[in-house]
Every structure is written in structure tokens, then in C-alpha cells.
């Protein structure tokens, strides 16, 4: 697994700036897991499901934390303040994200370019991007004081991810 990850890091060195570190840890690990499982004879679809299940299990503790945070009436305004700052520090090479102006009780972000899609497509696994999109759905779809809305996701065939959080 480590050897595969080292090869992937080398092959995707343009993405390895410090801002992309957290994304690449998840992305390249899942890609390497699929590659290793395939090399051991597991069909790709099963290998991808194995990686997806591991990721979904990993985020389970975050769901409770997110719901607790979103139980506050100020949650959407908090996102408006913190998310643009966070992404300025964590979106590196390969990302194109904008934060359109919106009403007081909404926060929107539009992702035009996503490194998950770019890298998974490069390795012939664009369907893996949808697995990461599902993480957003899992974390944000059932929040107590905010609706998580979108009309499209890059990983599910859209031209962008147009996410909006609207206060309930």
C-alpha cells in the first residue's frame, strides 16, 4: 500500500502543495487501496465499495459533531464566516471554488474544479468521485437547523457542485 501511495504522490506531484494535504491523504489512500485490492484479484467495483465503506465508517463520529454544531441558530452564519477562510487555507492546486453572495440565512459555495474528479478520472475511476460526494450528503443532509441543498455534483455527472446551506 505504501509503495502504491508513493507512486501516486510522485505521479500527482503538481497537487502536493501544503493546502491540499488533507484532501490528498484521503484521496490517494482510497485510490491506493483500490489499486492494491485489484492487484490481489478483487474486482474493481468490490474494491471501490470496500474503500467507500471504510471512509463512511471513518466519518461516523463526525456526523454527531456536525449535528450538534448545526443545532445552533447561528450555524449558517458561522459557515459564512469560517468556510471561505478555511478553504483559502486548504484548497490548493487544482481547485476552483467561489462563494457567491447570498441572503443572511444562506451560505453558498460553487466548486467548478475538484481534485477528486481530476485525479480519479486520470486513473480511470471517475465513479470514485461520487463516493466522496456522498460523504457531503452523509454529513450535511440531516442537519437540525439547516437544509443542505444542491442541484448537481461533479462526481455525479454535474458540471459543478452548487452547495447551499439554508437556515431552517
Residue ranges and their predicted role:
Residues 4-5, 111-113, 134-135:
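Short, flexible segments with low predicted structural confidence
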Residues 20, 123-125:
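Short, contiguous strand/loop micro-motifs
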Residues 25-123:
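Amphipathic interaction/junction segments at domain boundaries or subunit interfaces
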Residues 105-108, 118-119, 126-168:
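C-terminal non-catalytic interaction appendages of large macromolecular assemblies
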Residues 18, 53-55, 113, 137, ...:
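Generic intrinsically disordered, low-complexity segments enriched for polar/acidic and small residues
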Amino acid at each position: 500500500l505504501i509503495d502504491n501511495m508513493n507512486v501516486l504522490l510522485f505521479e500527482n506531484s503538481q497537487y502536493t502543495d501544503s493546502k491540499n494535504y488533507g484532501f490528498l491523504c484521503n484521496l490517494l489512500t482510497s485510490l491506493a487501496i483500490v489499486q492494491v485490492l485489484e492487484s490481489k484479484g478483487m474486482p474493481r467495483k468490490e474494491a471501490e465499495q470496500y474503500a467507500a465503506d471504510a471512509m463512511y465508517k471513518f466519518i461516523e463520529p463526525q456526523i454527531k459533531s456536525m449535528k450538534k454544531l448545526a443545532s445552533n441558530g447561528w450555524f449558517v452564519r458561522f459557515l459564512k464566516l469560517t468556510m471561505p477562510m478555511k478553504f483559502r487555507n486548504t484548497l490548493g492546486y487544482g481547485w476552483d471554488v467561489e462563494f457567491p453572495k447570498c441572503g443572511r440565512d444562506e451560505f453558498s459555495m460553487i466548486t467548478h474544479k475538484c481534485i477528486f474528479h481530476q485525479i480519479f478520472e486520470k486513473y480511470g475511476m471517475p465513479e470514485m468521485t461520487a463516493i466522496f460526494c456522498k460523504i457531503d450528503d452523509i454529513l450535511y443532509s440531516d442537519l437540525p437547523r439547516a437544509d443542505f441543498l444542491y442541484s448537481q455534483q461533479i462526481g455525479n455527472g454535474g458540471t459543478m457542485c452548487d452547495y447551499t446551506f439554508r437556515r431552517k
